[in-house]
Amino acid sequence: MSAEGVEKLSLEIAASEEESVAPTEQQDVACGLENLPVSLWPLGAEPRPKPFQYTPDHVAGPGADIDPTQITFPGCACIETPCVPGTCSCLRHENNYDDNLCLRDVGSEGKYAKPVFECNVLCQCGMRCRNRVVQNGLHFLLQVFQTEKKGWGLRTLEFIPKGRFVCEYAGEVLGFSEVQRRIHLQTSHDSNYIIAVREHIYSGQIMETFVDPTYIGNIGRFLNHSCEPNLLMIPVRIDSMVPKLALFAAKDILPGEELSYDYSGRFLNQVSSKDKEKIDCSPPRKPCYCGAQSCTTFLPYDSSLYMAP
């Protein structure tokens, strides 16, 4: 083949690859509601993802104690000076992000026992404030794609540096009774998207947040579990006490790599002996296909959600 032919073939291959991943308005899973379109691949795959109403943010569902769209936090008064710890009311301890918008000290799970608060709509610091990251939405091109064994998954089409915000896990914020009702209506063939986030606060109490993106949700619903995930879920509060479930890169993530987090809420599969006992004694569960060396062979199981109401 001539040099001209090789060059033409290379261009055709490049164009074909670009068409296979390049988002278009017609295939935007996010329906134009995110900063960037989210493509679907392959377009003609069957079965198609189950239909759902797209929302980039939490919405109040049945039984929710607080409407996540209500603004309940006061704003900071940082007008002439940048938001820094000690002077900004939103940064009581230390900066949440560095100059590159990366979450600080990613990789230390214990580090994020502390709360993360961003500046909100009532703050006087402006939208260019460094303490506004999660609220600014997607910054990397993502794609919903069909996996070999796990159904639909989510991957990145761009390099994502360690510590950068990737996406939220958004959906209906539910009360516990509604969670139990929905759980008991599920069949063995249904996917469970409901996530329970439990935060231990200084008074010894536990704050619970239940989010279900089954019917109303965002691209976070396509994230699969991994026992060695590349994402870390952090509750981030902006306008109210209802946290945004923000997913950050736990390491550098290469283009084409599937995005995943640990459904159990742990990170890097740090299983305590007590948790291991719960896993061994739990009823039959769905197999895990993450392929990690530390794979527990089954998807995490939260028995508290399956208790009789």
Curated annotation (Swiss-Prot):
Which residues bind Zn(2+) 2 per the record? Answer: C76, C90, C119, C123
Residue ranges of domain Post-SET in the record: 284-300
Entry-linked InterPro entries? H3K9_Histone-Lys_N-MTase, Post-SET_dom, Pre-SET_dom, SET_dom, SET_dom_sf
Which residues are noted in the entry as Zn(2+) 3-binding?
A: C83, C119, C125, C129
Name the predominant localization: nucleus
This enzyme's EC code(s): 2.1.1.357
Q: Where is the SET domain?
A: 140-264
Listed binding positions for Zn(2+) 1 are: C76, C78, C83, C88
- Sorted UniProt keywords: Chromatin regulator, Chromosome, Metal-binding, Methyltransferase, Nucleus, S-adenosyl-L-methionine, Transferase, Zinc
A molecular function (GO) held by this record is: histone H3K4 methyltransferase activity
Gene Ontology process terms (BP): methylation; negative regulation of DNA-templated transcription; negative regulation of gene expression, epigenetic
**Which PROSITE patterns does the record associate with it?**
POST_SET, PRE_SET, SET
The catalytic activity, as recorded, is: L-lysyl(36)-[histone H3] + 2 S-adenosyl-L-methionine = N(6),N(6)-dimethyl-L-lysyl(36)-[histone H3] + 2 S-adenosyl-L-homocysteine + 2 H(+)
| Pre-SET domain location | 74-137
Q: Where in the cell is it found?
A: Nucleus; Chromosome
Tell me a GO cellular component: chromosome
Q: Where does S-adenosyl-L-methionine bind?
A: K150, G151, W152, Y193, R221, N224, H225
Binding-site positions, Zn(2+) 4: C227, C288, C290, C295
Which family, according to UniProt? Belongs to the class V-like SAM-binding methyltransferase superfamily.
Record function comment: Histone methyltransferase that methylates 'Lys-4' and 'Lys-36' of histone H3, 2 specific tags for epigenetic transcriptional activation. Specifically mediates dimethylation of H3 'Lys-36'.
Recorded domain comment: In the pre-SET domain, Cys residues bind 3 zinc ions that are arranged in a triangular cluster; some of these Cys residues contribute to the binding of two zinc ions within the cluster.
Q: What is this protein called?
A: Histone-lysine N-methyltransferase SETMAR
Biological source species:
Mus musculus (Mouse)
